Every structure is written in C-alpha cells, then in structure tokens.
C-alpha cells in the first residue's frame, strides 16, 4: 500500500537504553549458538511494529535474502530470536511461517520497492505455493514476553493489522562469526 508509517526501527537509530540490553544477553546468544552449533555475533537488533488499525503487510520472504543482498552477509548461517512486546494474536497480524522451508536453501527473490514503505527481497507466488503445499502455514501466537526462534532461510510473512491491538516484536539477528 506504500504507506509512510515506521515499520521497523534498528537499535542504531534508537540509542541505548534498557531495551538494548536484550541484545547482549549471553543466555539468548548462547541458545542461538547451541542451535546453530557455532559462535555467533549480533548482526542486527530491531523492533518491528504493527500499529493498531494501520499495521501493514510483510510480503513472503526469507530474511537471509535481505541480509545477503543489502548487508552482504556471506553465508546463511544466521537466525532470528523474536521476543513479543505485545500479545500476538491470530487477529493482529501475526507472523505466518512455512514450516521446514529453511531446508529449501537460499531461494531466488525479487527486490520489491513498491508494495510497502520497506524495500524487501520477496518470493514469487509459485515458490510460496509449492512450499506451503509441502509444509503448510503456522502463525505462532503468545503473550508479551513470549519468544520464537527461526533460521534466516525460513519463509515467512504477515498480513496487515486492522484491529485495535498493536503487535510489536523485538528481533535479534544472530550470525556465525
């Protein structure tokens, strides 16, 4: 829809403060290291929000596509830790994940500069349809403070939020050293 609302805010533009402490929590990074089996560093720390009544869509994508093309991340040995700042409900634009899609590897993506205010490397409908046929779609929900971890190649997206309930999620992106 091309709205001009803020959809994502990185820690570099937020300054420090208590929220930045989450990014250096050894327990979180340690859990990621256990999952990927190697030492990790924090590549990115951001808050993605979907405002009440105005939260926009996130097209189907893999985060690694953006990290590779925009950040020049050399390999796909990366993951996200998502921490819910608001309750994530089936109705307020939860993440929709395609289970096991990370096993398809780094998929061909196109740079979408027009759909929303955030340029994103997105997947075509045929690719998403095949992956969904194989793995289905899940939309994890949870209370504020809930956590979700997923590989950078996991295909995901989310619908808009037209409810009175905001949905904010902190993301720690961890990458192999």
Say what each PLM segment does.
Residues 57-65, 154-158, 172:
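Histidine-centered catalytic micro-motifs
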Residues 44, 76-82, 92, 137-139, ...:
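Extracellular structured ligand-interaction cores
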Residues 1-71:
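Non-heme Fe(II)-dependent double-stranded beta-helix
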Residues 65-78, 135-136, 142, 165-166:
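A short beta-loop-beta micro-motif enriched in histidine and acidic residues
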Residues 159-163:
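Short proline/glycine-enriched turn/loop segments at secondary-structure junctions
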Residues 38, 69-75, 84-94, 102:
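Active-site region of the double-stranded beta-helix
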Residues 80-83, 99, 165-177:
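A short hydrophobic beta-strand segment most commonly corresponding to one strand
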Residues 88-155:
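Double-stranded beta-helix
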